[in-house]
Amino acid sequence: MFIARSHIDLHNIRQSVERIGNISDNVVHFGPVKLGLEAVLEFVPFVGEIYSVIAGGLLIIEGMRARVPGTTLMAVTFLIGVRTLIGTGNLVPGIGVIAEIAAAAFRAHKISADMIARAMDDTLYIEGHKGDPEYADVLARVRAGTEKRRVVYLG
């Protein structure tokens, strides 16, 4: 099942998104500096870029499953693309180490995971069908203009 159909699916998606963000950018703490698996893998040729693309792809897929707004998915895709391009700077002679350090410092996965989680928080997910009382209540609030959140029906 690709699209989330229940609040349990949404809970699992959120856990997955947070896990990817934390593993990528928040595993080891050196005072105010936080490093993750991505920063360590960045210094192995091509492994950091492959990890970045896979982890970023998983974040985008989970965002699609949670039906976050397209603008959020575009921003996440942009961040992951920029992060991957920075990481490929090691292919240019003379700037390899600088590019590796910049890629390790750019926390694109954590930022992207936080953007997806925030978009999920700003969405009212309704589990049910058109005949349910909750559906009618939300529809009335939307028509009256009192519901300011984005509404997504899971059923």
Language-model regions, residue ranges each:
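Feature detects long, helix-prone N-terminal segments enriched in hydrophobes
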Residues: 1-155
